[in-house]
């Protein structure tokens, strides 16, 4: 490959915009292929009791991997199998309960063609996505989804560009149509993304991160202010609960309450905690989502909340706990 000097006046931005325009035209053509064949493909995938197995070679394989990943994260159980590996044993992963999606822009992939007779013998439903309705794969398919584009964005017409974009979008169309048909929710999405921010917000509950047992700062209502301050210092949560031996809540005392005590003046050594506590305290139940507790704390401008069942203290949640858990 020759490495020539950059042509004088070459416009990178214009070249990029031309690609966008060509690919935009390709996607506009795709609209006509969302038809009865698309409906049939969706129905086969929706009614599949096994998994949706995606196959493709080369660039089609890269698109297929992304397609399978999108299906799997949006409620359609799916995985990718390389056609070459399938021909050497991995086809054993495919069962008659599955649906196979085979991708090839030309529709003449020899690796996939070698698998079709076996898939037919196993009675595995076959959906082929190609850019040529007259291709051998299109003719062999139970359902053919056409992704034909006017031309590739590559000026040589060689590098898959517009065609791979169209295939990717067709996969997204299938995934989202099925998502809507299944009534797939954000909570369902979070179950397959527990490590992400959305997963933490939609799965993590107060009971998962609250302080319990000896970690809870607490004194009884007969304690002095000094006793309460010592407990706050020991437990390092900036507050203490006032409760009886059975952990029935009487109130709460926070660093904000302490500032108000200073404003009162007088001899603080003589004060009982019952005189300066906030009765009751703001409470949440342990089963609520941590993000809901966060919203409550932010709306009430507080840094900690009691976790309780009625008047029975179960735990304490601090803003720092939410920060550590990645909810904030």
Curated annotation (Swiss-Prot):
Its EC number is 5.3.1.13. Signal peptide: none annotated. Residues 41-184 form the SIS domain. The keyword Isomerase applies. It comes from the Bacteria. It is an enzyme of class 5 (isomerase). Zn(2+) binds at residue 82. Residues 210-268, 277-328 form the CBS domain. GO terms for biological process: lipopolysaccharide biosynthetic process. Homotetramer. Involved in the biosynthesis of 3-deoxy-D-manno-octulosonate (KDO), a unique 8-carbon sugar component of lipopolysaccharides (LPSs). Catalyzes the reversible aldol-ketol isomerization between D-ribulose 5-phosphate (Ru5P) and D-arabinose 5-phosphate (A5P). This is Arabinose 5-phosphate isomerase KdsD. The lineage of its organism: Bacteria, Pseudomonadati, Pseudomonadota, Gammaproteobacteria, Enterobacterales. The gene is kdsD.
């Amino acid at each position: 490959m020759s490495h020539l000097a950059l042509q004088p006046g070459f416009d990178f931005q214009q070249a990029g915009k031309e690609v966008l325009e060509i690919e935009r035209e390709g996607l506009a053509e795709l609209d006509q292929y969302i038809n009865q064949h698309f409906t049939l493909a969706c129905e086969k995938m929706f009614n599949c009791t096994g998994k949706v197995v995606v196959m493709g070679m080369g660039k089609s394989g890269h698109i297929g991997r992304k397609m399978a990943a999108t299906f799997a994260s949006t409620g359609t159980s799916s995985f990718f199998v390389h056609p070459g590996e399938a021909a050497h044993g991995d086809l054993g992963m495919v069962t008659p309960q599955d649906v196979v999606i085979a991708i090839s822009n030309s529709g003449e992939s020899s690796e996939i063609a070698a698998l079709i007779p076996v898939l037919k013998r196993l009675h595995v439903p076959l959906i082929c996505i190609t850019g040529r309705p007259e291709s051998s794969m299109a003719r062999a398919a139970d359902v053919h989804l056409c992704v034909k584009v006017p031309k590739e964005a590559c000026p040589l017409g060689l590098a898959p560009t517009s065609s791979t974009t169209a295939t990717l979008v067709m996969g997204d169309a299938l995934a989202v149509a099925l998502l809507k048909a299944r009534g797939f929710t954000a909570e369902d999405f979070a179950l397959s993304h527990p490590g992400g921010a959305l997963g933490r917000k939609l799965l993590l509950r107060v009971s998962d991160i609250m302080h319990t047992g000896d970690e809870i700062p607490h004194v009884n209502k007969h304690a002095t202010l000094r006793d309460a301050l010592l407990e706050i210092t020991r437990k390092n949560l900036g507050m203490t609960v006032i409760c009886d031996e059975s952990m029935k809540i009487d109130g709460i005392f926070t660093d904000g309450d302490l500032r108000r005590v200073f404003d009162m003046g007088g001899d603080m050594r003589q004060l009982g905690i019952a005189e300066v506590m906030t009765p009751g305290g703001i409470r949440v139940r342990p089963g609520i989502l941590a993000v809901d507790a966060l919203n409550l704390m932010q709306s009430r401008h507080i840094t900690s909340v009691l976790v309780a069942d009625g008047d029975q203290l179960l735990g304490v949640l601090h803003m720092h706990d939410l920060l550590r858990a990645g909810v904030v």
